[in-house]
């Protein structure tokens, strides 16, 4: 059997981690249906899930960027890749900020 790739998954909210409510989709502190879906990937990947926070990305600010960067910096070692889930409203801003905050991170 091939070695499983080790993936660090950091969830921050957004639609991917939302749950339906009578008022529409809402952030879910447990990542919505995402954790259950991860079980399907267990044959090929060893996934470490860190639910960092659960907010609408329209509310993402530099304070959250720092928290995401800190989480990646403190936890990336020993992993083959890092995945950060994020809503689409401010994803480009967060991605840009993290690029500058995490220079030399040699992981996809």
Predicted regions and their residues:
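N-terminal glycine-rich anion-binding loop in soluble enzyme alpha/beta folds
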Residues: 2-76
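Hydrophobic structural segments
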Residues: 71, 75-77, 90, 96
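Structural motif
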Residues: 80-81
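Short Gly/Thr/Asp-enriched flexible loops that form oxyanion-binding sites at enzyme active sites
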Residues: 84-107
């Amino acid at each position: 059997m091939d070695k499983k790739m080790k993936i660090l998954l950091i969830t921050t909210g957004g639609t991917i981690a939302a749950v339906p409510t009578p008022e529409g989709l809402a952030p879910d502190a447990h990542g919505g249906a995402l954790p259950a879906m991860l079980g399907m990937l267990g044959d090929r990947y060893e996934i470490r899930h860190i639910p960092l926070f659960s907010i609408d990305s329209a509310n993402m600010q530099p304070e959250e960027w720092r928290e995401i960067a800190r989480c990646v910096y403190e936890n990336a070692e020993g992993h083959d890749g890092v995945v950060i889930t994020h809503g689409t409203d401010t994803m480009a801003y967060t991605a840009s900020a993290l690029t500058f905050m995490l220079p030399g991170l040699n992981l996809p």
